[in-house]
């Protein structure tokens, strides 16, 4: 059953039509993911559904009594207010009705108020707020001004949830959230009993949350059942069909144009209906809105750096009593694509500054490579002068930029990033969040750099631009450091991941091969290895030194092992010890930066053997545990 529907909606700003006969419905209990290009009108559509804006034409129908709550992309709160007071605004009607009842104002119908109080559960609004704060791990007594962007997002969600809405509208809910918070939000939304409509460019989030995707494209809404992965398959088929249909229509139009030019005689001998048909074809082609242009990304890689970008040995960093990095070891080589993941405030930026020489460690050593030319992408956009034009931002004092050794006019370069010449002369302050990120990317890629540092580059970028950025970074010859909470982006770009694991020990960071999913798999495997290794030690110590193992084994086992199994059990501790020793030796070899230069073939074999040892060690420990349980 549809709880709301929008039909034949039209909305335009100037000559740009954002909605052009758009229509969709939202079913009870479904989670709708709204996607589309930056500037396509997604936020405007969400505000229309929320009742904050009105379309130029069209009809929005809601079921009677439908409660809708809208959480904007950047919630604005009174910085001096407490979290409890802000969240309580979500039950403003319940508070007002109960206050009116308690004040017994003259002429007030107390029976009607009592009925309304019970309908709103107004007697218990404080408990509802407290319960919601507890569920979202928020401290009601804290001032909002003290909170991070991610915690402010939680406050906005709490304010919406405490109202018990039938429909929850979310605009970019994952912005400013770390990976743990995103996983928490996914679980919360999957358990939400009402309907959800959200805008996000986080493809993994859409895969895990959405039950249907709707795409706003050239003013029209198209619906795709399933999550984002299902949408990708359907979209590919749809675009192929559209291309074939357009080609057929253009061919037919060309044939009719040839006929109409044959002259008066042809028009006398042919049906007037054919002329009318041609006019219809011309009108259809003029009305057909072509797909928007694609961002074209190029990057100036500058002169190559040395083979080693940075070598860190037992590096630690603390600020007072707070330990951000403890005993970290890593070797970063030219061409590595390194992802840094961890919760907000864990020290990702601090670790990056240590690697790049902007901070000196309180302990340990950092050896940095030669000829490093570093370019930064700033997630807070602090490098942008809001009063400067786009052209001056990209190329101050010049009409030309140099990219990849070739000169290019700044207007042409900005056009590659979908900025028209008129837009190129506009001040930065007139741009949306996504457009400002595109300007930052344009500026970043115009710099001659062999090391790129990207801090949350995916915020506000549409999916098409994200995919093109992924392709560019994959083919980039220099070194990339990427701080991101976009799991799909990490998986598609990075070759290794430096992950915060401070929940085990303060300031602990570990390096893993591969992206986010590989990190999750390897971390789970390593955790299992550590747990099993911890169990084997007390077992060995418990055995009397002089007691022969075969004689002791049958007493401890419910079923006697076979001779072959007993021999295997006796040999397994030796094999495990040997594998651990080999693993340690290979780790020491891999940590030697000079070895990569002296014998790259040997290092490739060592890397391969390192992965094999993990598998063999895990298998040996599991077998030892299985035999020991018999």
What is each model feature region?
Residues 1-247, 293, 297-630:
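ABC ATP-binding cassette signature C-motif
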């Amino acid at each position: 059953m549809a709880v709301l529907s929008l039909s034949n909606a039209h909305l335009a700003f100037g000559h740009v039509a954002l909605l052009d006969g758009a229509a969709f419905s939202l079913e009870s209990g479904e989670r709708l993911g709204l996607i589309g290009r930056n500037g396509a009108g997604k936020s405007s559509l969400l505000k229309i559904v929320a009742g904050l804006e009105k379309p130029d034409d069209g009809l929005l129908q809601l079921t009677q009594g439908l409660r809708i709550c809208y959480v904007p992309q950047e919630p604005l709160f009174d910085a001096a207010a407490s979290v409890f007071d802000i969240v309580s605004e979500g039950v403003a009607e319940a508070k007002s009705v109960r206050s009116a009842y308690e004040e017994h104002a003259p002429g007030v119908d107390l029976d009607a108020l009592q009925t309304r109080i019970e309908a709103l559960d107004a007697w218990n609004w404080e408990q509802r707020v407290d319960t919601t704060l507890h569920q979202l791990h928020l401290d009601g007594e804290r001032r909002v001004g003290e909170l991070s962007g991610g915690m402010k997002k939680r406050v906005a969600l709490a304010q919406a949830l405490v109202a018990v809405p039938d429909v929850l509208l979310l605009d970019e809910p994952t912005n400013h959230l770390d990976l743990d918070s995103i996983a928490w939000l996914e679980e919360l939304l999957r358990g939400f009993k009402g309907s959800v409509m959200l805008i996000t460019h986080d493809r993994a989030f859409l895969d895990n949350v959405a039950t249907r995707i709707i795409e706003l494209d050239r003013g029209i809404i198209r619906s795709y059942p399933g999550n984002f992965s299902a949408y990708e398959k359907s979209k590919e088929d749809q675009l192929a069909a559209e291309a074939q249909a357009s080609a057929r229509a253009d061919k037919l139009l060309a044939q009719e144009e040839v006929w109409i030019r044959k002259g008066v005689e042809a028009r006398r001998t042919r049906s007037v209906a054919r002329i009318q048909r041609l006019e219809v074809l011309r009108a259809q082609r003029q009305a057909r809105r072509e797909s928007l242009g694609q961002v074209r990304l190029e990057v100036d890689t500058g002169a190559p750096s040395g083979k080693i970008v940075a070598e860190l040995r037992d590096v630690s960093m603390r600020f007072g009593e707070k330990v951000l990095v403890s005993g970290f070891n890593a070797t970063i080589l030219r061409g590595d694509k390194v992802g840094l993941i961890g919760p907000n405030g864990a020290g990702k930026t601090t670790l990056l500054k240590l690697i790049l020489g902007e901070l000196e460690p309180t302990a340990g050593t950092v050896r940095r490579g030669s000829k490093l030319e570093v370019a930064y992408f700033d997630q807070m956009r602090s490098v942008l002068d809001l009063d400067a034009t786009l052209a001056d931002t990209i190329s101050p004092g010049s009409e030309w930029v140099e990219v990849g050794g070739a000169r290019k006019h700044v207007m042409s370069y900005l056009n590659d990033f979908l900025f028209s010449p008129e837009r190129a002369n506009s001040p930065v302050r007139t741009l949306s969040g996504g457009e400002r990120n595109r300007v930052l990317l344009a500026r970043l890629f115009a710099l001659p750099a062999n090391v790129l540092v990207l801090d949350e580059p995916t915020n506000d970028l549409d999916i098409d631009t994200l995919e093109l950025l992924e392709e560019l970074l994959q083919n980039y010859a220099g070194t990339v450091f990427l701080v991101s909470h976009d799991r799909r982006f990490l998986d598609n770009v990075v070759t290794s991941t430096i992950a915060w694991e401070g929940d085990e020990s303060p300031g602990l960071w570990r390096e893993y091969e591969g992206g986010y999913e590989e990190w999750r798999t390897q971390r789970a495997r390593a955790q299992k290895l550590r747990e099993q290794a911890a169990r084997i030690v007390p077992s060995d110590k418990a055995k009397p030194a002089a007691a022969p193992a075969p004689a002791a084994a049958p007493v401890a086992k419910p079923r006697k092992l076979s001779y072959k199994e007993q021999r295997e059990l006796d040999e397994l501790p030796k094999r495990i010890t040997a594998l651990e020793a080999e693993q340690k030796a290979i780790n020491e070899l891999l940590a030697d930066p000079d070895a990569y230069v002296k014998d790259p073939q040997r290092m490739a074999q060592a890397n391969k053997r390192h992965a094999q040892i993990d598998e063999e060690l895990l298998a040996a420990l599991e077998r030892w545990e299985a035999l020991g349980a018999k």
